[in-house]
Amino acid sequence: MKTLSLFFTLVILISSCVSNLMAKHDSERKAPFSNHGMRLQHPPYLHFQSYRGHFIPEECTELCPQRCLRRHRLMVSCIPQHFCRCSSFQLSPPHIATSPKQYSKK
């Protein structure tokens, strides 16, 4: 009887830990990307742990070819000029405009 109660207590503790981890993971995926304290004015960013913990804009992953995403397990980066990169592949989406002041080099 004592073993049975310990088993149920352990199951309850494990399930609460798993639910907390899942909630934390969901909040990380919805967090916006911050570059040197600056908040970029873009749609919400997705967080793919398979790409070195970087944040990837949704529009970037949508524009990059699916074969590139599948082959490299979402190893896609999106630099400030909105170039989608996957290994040697590069795509410049013409319809995404950025402000010249926002990314001007000093």
Swiss-Prot record:
Biological processes annotated in GO:
defense response to fungus; killing of cells of another organism
Q: Could you tell me which cysteines form disulfide bridges?
A: C60-C78, C64-C84, C68-C86
- Report the GO terms under cellular component: extracellular region
- What domain of life does the UniProt record list for this protein's source? Eukaryota
Q: Which UniProt keywords apply?
A: Antimicrobial, Disulfide bond, Fungicide, Plant defense, Secreted, Signal
Signal peptide bounds: 1-23
* Subcellular localization, as worded in the UniProt entry: Secreted
Where is the major localization of this protein? Answer: secreted
User: Family, per the entry?
Assistant: Belongs to the DEFL family.
**The protein's name:** Putative defensin-like protein 224
